[in-house]
Amino acid sequence: MSGGKSGGKAAVAKSAQSRSAKAGLAFPVGRVHRLLRKGNYAQRVGAGAPVYLAAVLEYLAAEILELAGNAARDNKKTRIIPRHLQLAIRNDEELNKLLGHVTIAQGGVVPNINAHLLPKTSGRTGKPSQEL
């Protein structure tokens, strides 16, 4: 007889799974946790805080990259450059508010011409004049 109470099947060893994989995230939960601990933001850091923060950062990155990809496609380009990031952020109301004081290197400016500076179009629709 073998020692131990439990009979039946032997316990199958589980392979190690990262916290990012458990949460279904691409961003590194372990690294975010380490940065929160080393950053002196608080004396203690809960277990759920780095998971939540990594999820928020992943969502923001995905949102910005999707809009920048659309801007690149509109300009018939396949590579996202800083100009596309600038256009994506400045044309989105919420992202512009969040990143309002951020300067993007090589981003340029958003094209905008004041309506007063545009040439005035005539209101006539092409009726011939009655003058001789």
Swiss-Prot record:
The modification N-acetylserine is found at S2. Phosphorylated to form H2AS128ph (gamma-H2A) in response to DNA double-strand breaks (DSBs) generated by exogenous genotoxic agents and by stalled replication forks. Phosphorylation is dependent on the DNA damage checkpoint kinases rad3/ATR and tel1/ATM, spreads on either side of a detected DSB site and may mark the surrounding chromatin for recruitment of proteins required for DNA damage signaling and repair. Gamma-H2A is required for recruiting crb2, a modulator of DNA damage checkpoint signaling, to DSB sites. InterPro entries: Histone-fold (IPR009072), Histone_H2A (IPR002119), Histone_H2A/H2B/H3 (IPR007125), Histone_H2A_C (IPR032454), Histone_H2A_CS (IPR032458). It comes from the Eukaryota. Pfam families: Histone (PF00125), Histone_H2A_C (PF16211). GO terms for biological process: double-strand break repair; heterochromatin formation; homologous chromosome segregation; mitotic chromosome condensation; mitotic DNA damage checkpoint signaling; mitotic G2 DNA damage checkpoint signaling. A motif ([ST]-Q motif) lies at residues 129-130. GO terms for molecular function: chromatin-protein adaptor activity; DNA binding; protein heterodimerization activity; structural constituent of chromatin. The modification N6-acetyllysine is found at K5, K9. The modification N5-methylglutamine is found at Q106. Changing S129A: Causes hypersensitivity to DNA-damage-inducing agents and impairs recruitment of crb2 to DSB sites. Loss of interaction with mdb1. Transmembrane segments: none annotated. GO terms for cellular component: chromosome, subtelomeric region; mating-type region heterochromatin; nucleosome; nucleus; pericentric heterochromatin; rDNA heterochromatin. Belongs to the histone H2A family. Core component of nucleosome which plays a central role in DNA double strand break (DSB) repair. Nucleosomes wrap and compact DNA into chromatin, limiting DNA accessibility to the cellular machineries which require DNA as a template. Histones thereby play a central role in transcription regulation, DNA repair, DNA replication and chromosomal stability. DNA accessibility is regulated via a complex set of post-translational modifications of histones, also called histone code, and nucleosome remodeling. In contrast to vertebrates and insects, its C-terminus is not monoubiquitinated. This is Histone H2A-alpha.
